[in-house]
Each structure stands twice: as structure tokens, then as C-alpha cells.
Amino acid sequence: MGPPLKLFKNQKYQELKQDCMKDGRLFCDPTFLPENDSLFFNRLLPGKVVWKRPQDISDDPHLIVGNISNHQLIQGRLGNKAMISAFSCLAVQESHWTKAIPNHKEQEWDPRKPEKYAGIFRFRFWHFGEWTEVVIDDLLPTINGDLVFSFSTSMNEFWNALLEKAYAKLLGCYEALDGLTITDIIMDFTGTLAEIIDMQKGRYTDLVEEKYKLFGELYKTFTKGGLISCSIESPSQEEQEVETDWGLLKGYTYTMTDIRKLRLGERLVEVFSTEKLYMVRLRNPLGRQEWSGPWSEISEEWQQLTVTDRKNLGLVMSDDGEFWMSLEDFCHNFHKLNVCRNVNNPVFGRKELESVVGCWTVDDDPLMNRSGGCYNNRDTFLQNPQYIFTVPEDGHKVIMSLQQKDLRTYRRMGRPDNYIIGFELFKVEMNRRFRLHHLYIQERAGTSTYIDTRTVFLSKYLKKGNYVLVPTMFQHGRTSEFLLRIFSEVPVQLRELTLDMPKMSCWNLARGYPKVVTQITVHSAEGLEKKYANETVNPYLTIKCGKEEVRSPVQKNTVHAIFDTQAIFYRRTTDIPIIIQVWNSRKFCDQFLGQVTLDADPSDCRDLKSLYLRKKGGPTAKVKQGHISFKVISSDDLTEL
């Protein structure tokens, strides 16, 4: 069973189609009429628009002619390049386009049974976290007999024109499609999670290791059903569509249609002086201006391969506008990568995506307000919603996506464009369960771009630990909904922090409700004990308060360990000490290296401290070798930290 399906405008495709067939009429959609209001709310029409059905445009109309990816698409006089690029990308993976165009064979024209055609189509979009089915009629806007928006070079193929109309209906009108990015459109067509990679910032041409790591990620994404596109930025409008020295177009988005790591046979190793080739195949949605550099059809490299070589290696091209290029040339020529990961396929096992819908709301009470503005608003910033997640091991890449509810559908009513949004990421205590109130010790682990696009992204390789993500609008005091999605190779247990402090309950009142909150960061342990010169010391920390304990990751083979381990405790009294212990991780029995015992009173200094380790037995126990550096902050205001 697939995901729950929402019916846009509550229109039921099968019922509407049956009614039309019963009455012997073609469907005309009362919720998206063939009128100028369905086209624009601000722009002027360039001519008289006549709405025509496909059979009035072509003698032999079809939804799809042959293979969906075989024909080039044209943006039309009022269309946009991003839409054409997204269509081209969508056509690469059948699992995605068949989701956007459900039961396409059933929706197809059948000349043998014309009575079954009712002029009605349905398409599905991933809209703000829900799969939504949109029903349309087949009336398409034309000027002088030509389609106004996108059309296929196969003049009797209409899937893209009809899909574009359904998308326009979902967003309010055709004008609402203007300004959408290719990542916005692909996410709406597929439900994938997008990441935008700056090729120049990543220095993939300079750093060999990073280049091959990128190839590995792209290969994994593509083979798992992801969609990848790339573009060359143009510094000015005048340079849009200008051809580079190697035949590539600036300002256009190219679709990746294949990616291969090739092992060469003995003869080809001699020819190319390498045992492996890292290759990508790209397609220009316009079907022209192909790559003319190495591995192009006119290149020396290509000519040195026989037809059999190309077939055996998989270096084949099925469409006009397709070409192969090496990973090195790919990294050198393109500036931006749009990587849309397929996160909805259960075949791949592990739960890789976690998501939550939230909202920014306004309240006069600072503890209830959830619209605190960006990081610049230091007094109110932490009044935003807060979400915590856990990275279970070092070195996992985490992709974070924050999407605001698109306001384009309300522009007709005078509502503003999208808000400027972004988010901040903080590494927090390993046992945090309540909201952040001040940032005394937390490490700022990342920040997204702040921009008025629908979606902002951030990808980071994160260390093991807990992280709090704070989604924000740039200005405080605004209200809106948002969708937060986090993708990782391992589950990260995304959840919202809603409470400010421990709840009052019969249980904790009987045991004693907390009166003090204490936050501690252990920065390092240095000069640790070694019994003999070649002994291996693998230190780790435990931070204890009563029955609660936090344990740090193990540091390998060092007597000077950097931990930066954080913990927070809600204590009934300062008579319950905090004990920091250092241990040596060993195969059979861990070795105690020393401890520090702290009262952590609210009146204590909050600066960085350094204390010698001692044996067990309290603050007056015998001193041992080594010392730790730490910072402790205590407060009798449970909502300070």
C-alpha cells in the first residue's frame, strides 16, 4: 500500500470520468477554468489566448509517444527553463515519472475506443509532505494555434503540457510557476530530498580525495533512483545561453542520465594509460550544443574505442543531446550540482529520512512564543521551535532541509512572496531533554543560507552526539508553517523539544523537584597516567550526577585527549555532587585513571577551570597523575540554560 493520498479540491478522478462517459461529454474543470485568471495575475498576455484540446492541435494525440525520454522539450514563448530541465530530469527514472503520472496507459488515448476518452487527466505531486492528486481537463492555452507553455518536439505528445497545467492548478495559476528552482519542481514531482553542491567551493578539481568521494556519493544516489542535474552559472544576463569553448551552454541545466566506474582491459589500459575510468553521461534538454571536449563523439578518445568497446563498457548514448565526459572534466566545467535523493524507496532498507511539520507562532509569553527571528536577534532567537536529533557515530553525512509553506498560491490575494528563512545547528549536551534558553557552552555546528526561496538546505559531516536544529524566519514575530526533513545513512531520531524544564509530577515532588540546573563541558584531559612507556591509553569520560550518567566517545592512543563532552543535570540540591571520571578503555577490564568531584553551586565562577585528577573518595582524595579542563555553569533558574 502506498502513502496516503490527498485529493486536491476533493475531486475524485474516477467518479468525474465515469460521469463524463455516461453523459457522452468531455470534462471541463470548474475549479480551474480556461480563463485568463488561470494564466496570470500580474503579467500581460502577449496575444489572444485560445484554449484547445489536444485533438484540436494534433490529428493523433498521445500522452506519451514511445519512450518518455526520447523527445526533446521546448519551453514555449511563456514557459521557463527550470520547468523544462525538471521534465528532462524526471524522465530519467521511470520509478519517479510513473508516480507523477499514475496509470499512464489507462489515461492514454485509445483510437480503437474513442468513447473511453473523457478529456480528464490526473497527476500527483508531493506537496508540503503529502502526496496530492490533481485532476484537470485537457484544455491547453494556445496563441495562433501554438501551445503557449512547454511542448514536445514530437508534436502529438502532451504529457509535459498536461503535467505543467496540473502543477499550475496546484499552485494557483501558470504565473505561480515563475521563479521556481529546478530543485523545488523536482521535489514536488518526486518527493525526493534535494542537496545543492557548490562545485567550486568544494574544490573538487584540486582535491583528488574529495573528487572521488563526490563520485561515490553521486553513483550511490543515481543507482538508488536519485535525480542529478548540473549547471554552469553565468555572471550576467547577457551571458545566459552563451556557449563555452567546449560547447556547453551557460545558464542551462544538464541532466545526468548515467554514471559509471569502468575497469579497462589490457589493450585499453595501454591506450589510455589508466586501469579505471570515472565517467558521467549528461543530456542537454534542448538536444543541441553538446560537449566537444574529451570523450565527445568527435574526440580522439571516442574514436579510439571500437563499437564493441563502447558496448562492452556501457558507453552508449540513446538520445540526441547526450554525451559522455570524464569525472575530471565534469568537476572542472560545472559550477552547481542539484542532487535529489530518492528517500521514499523501502527497497533500500534502513530508515534514512525523518521529517516533521511545524509552525512559527507568536505569543506574548517568551516561553510560549515560537517566532524569535534569526540568530541576530539574540534575545529572542531561542524562542523559535527547536528539534533535537542524535548522530550515533562519527563521520556520517547529514542533509537537512527546511521548507516553508509556499505563499505563491496567495499572491493573487495580495499576500507577500516567500519569507526569508534559514536554520542554525548546535551541538548540545549528550543528555539534553529540554529546550535551550541560552547558548553558554553549545558549539555552533552549522548554519544554512538565509534566503526567500521555498527551501533551504545544509549538508554536514557530523561527529557523534546530540544536535539541536533551530528553524527560523529572518524577522521575528511572523507566523507560517514549515516542513523539516533530515536525511542520513543511519536513523537520527528527530524529535521536537517542547518542554522548558522537568514536569511537576507526584513522582518528582515525592523525590524532590529540581532546584538547580547544571551545565558542564569537559574540554580535555591531559598528562594522563601510563604505567610503562609503550602502554596504549584509550581514554574516555563519564560525567555522573546521582543515578544519571553521560559517557563520552573513546579517544584512541593518547594521554592528551580532547573531548568537548557536554552534559546537563537537573538537581534537587547542590549536596548531590557531579563526578567526572577518566577511564582507559581496555579489552577485558577498563582502568580507572582518576576523577574530579564538583559541588557546582550557582555562585561558582563560570570560567574555564583546570583541576588535577584524584583517586576515588571526594575532593580531598589523593592526587593522581593528569588534569582535566572544564567549564561548569549552575543556576537556580531552571529556564536559564
Swiss-Prot record:
SUPFAM superfamilies: C2 domain (Calcium/lipid-binding domain, CaLB) (SSF49562), Calpain large subunit, middle domain (domain III) (SSF49758), Cysteine proteinases (SSF54001). Keywords: Cytoplasm, Cytoskeleton, Microtubule. It is found in: Cytoplasm, Perinuclear region; Cytoplasm, Cytoskeleton, Spindle. Residues 26-343 form the Calpain catalytic domain. Signal peptide: none annotated. The keyword Cytoplasm applies. GO terms for molecular function: microtubule binding. GO terms for biological process: microtubule bundle formation; regulation of cytoskeleton organization. Residues 344-495 are annotated as: Domain III. Gene3D superfamilies: 2.60.120.380, C2 domain (2.60.40.150), Cysteine proteinases (3.90.70.10). Transmembrane segments: none annotated. Residues 498-621 form the C2 domain. GO terms for cellular component: cytoplasm; microtubule; perinuclear region of cytoplasm; spindle microtubule. InterPro entries: C2_Calpain, C2_dom, C2_domain_sf, C2_III, Calpain_cysteine_protease, Calpain_domain_III, Calpain_III, Calpain_III_sf. It holds the Pfam family C2. The keyword Membrane does not apply. It comes from the Eukaryota. Belongs to the peptidase C2 family. Interacts (via domain III) with microtubules. Interacts (via domain II) with ARHGEF2 (via the N-terminal zinc finger). Microtubule-stabilizing protein that may be involved in the regulation of microtubule dynamics and cytoskeletal organization. May act as a regulator of RAC1 activity through interaction with ARHGEF2 to control lamellipodial formation and cell mobility. Does not seem to have protease activity as it has lost the active site residues. This is Calpain-6. It comes from Rattus norvegicus. The gene is Capn6.
